[in-house]
């Protein structure tokens, strides 16, 4: 079962406009898919790996601890129903394949990722001290933007 919600509380942040968190709504991304793409993705499960193409967190932990972390793998539906809405539930950083296996896996992954992060689905949160953000992990992609300086955040994830 995927984690449901994440809460992030900022305690120390760089200057406003630096160290933002970028969010992409996967409800809107799903709604904007063509009917044929909705059908295609609904018939597939994603194969995910903690050693995926942009597993930055894993690489940082290995660097800190000096030892390899065991790879975690999972599969789940790419299109997920949440209450009465549908969302794309796929992590560009960890998707490594599809079940059943398909031709042109790389092409479909690229097309899906490009669609998921379209500007019209995005919001950039400019952190201020003691600000709280809460989001649904099942329907929202998120990533920190690169920055210089220090940032202290307290994070809680609800399973």
PLM-predicted stretches and their roles:
Residues 1-129, 137-159:
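Non-heme Fe(II) oxygenase catalytic core, chiefly the N-lobe of the double-stranded beta-helix
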